[in-house]
Amino acid sequence: MKKEMQERYILGIDQGGTKTAAAVMRGDGFIVGQALARGAYFPNEGMESAAAAMQEAVEGALKSAAVDCEDIELTVAGIGGVDWPGDDAAVKGALQERLSLGEIFVCNDAVIAFYSGTLRSHGAVICAGTGMNGALIDREGRQFVYGDYMEEKAQGGSALARRAARKVFDAELGLCPPTKLTQLFLGQAEVPDVDTLLKRYMTEDAFRKELRFLVPQILMVAESGDAVACGLIVEFAEEIADYIEAGFRKMKMNPEEEEVVLAGSVFKGMENPLTKQVVKRMGERFAGAKVMQVHYEPVVGACIMGLIRLQMEPSEREKAIRESASVLGLCYG
């Protein structure tokens, strides 16, 4: 029986604009191969380009694991851009055309991020990097992905940076107190005053986009006690908590019985002021809700989701998952 379990293989795929990752997990929880390829976002680049990147990553992972496509019992693919009915079927078809894989399950990449933070089958995840997305999975396996229900002002690091810039302009106008954010943004723009900063902000699209790289410093300003930056973080955390609460309500899930996973660079570190505020807001609203950060790269979450779909309890394989992910550099922290 033990040999049979070890000979069952799950293939996990994670694709976003930055990279495409693939990993092979054995039935006993050990990750035995992985590979990376270029990133792709099929709504912008086309399915052929995205599928080619997936094929490259999958073939590399299979080679690393010394297994063939025919050895894979289940493939779980978390793909950025799977937002609308039919997108999953299109990705599945593109994979089947290129690779001799058996059963394939395709979902939005936010879904696999949930399983990179918990070994439970149900709960919620909020992913905040350059943008923001999230998903909920109930006890029956039904999914809800926020997608475009999350408005522009909530779009992760990009939105937080734009809102911080607005606080600088508000401070200059006298709508809020002076803030250390002003010097941060003047330094980034390499300009002497807020008037010149405002001109760059309003007329240079590339400059507005590069402001997202200031997110770590914005969080540091808040951590230093700057009242304006702290207020901004509290507002942002409150809105994130609103989305989480609304999602639970929509899915008719009891938040006090669920786990909420925070994923993405904007939430990095439990001492991160934004992370602390989200944890605080959720604790105030739902006494039993447990908020945690991701433990693994999303591709590991795809494999863990595969275990659950094959009714192979992940918690019984936790040690193997953790140790093999650590060896392969797939762990956070």
Regions found by a protein language model. Give the residues of each.
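Flexible, active-site-adjacent loop/turn segments at secondary-structure boundaries
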Residues: G80, F144, Y149, K199-R200, ...
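ATP-binding/phosphotransfer module of carbohydrate and carboxylate kinases, centering on a glycine-rich
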Residues: M1-E70, A94-E97, G117-H122, R166-G333
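Cell-envelope/extracellular polymer assembly enzymes that use nucleotide-activated donors
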Residues: E73
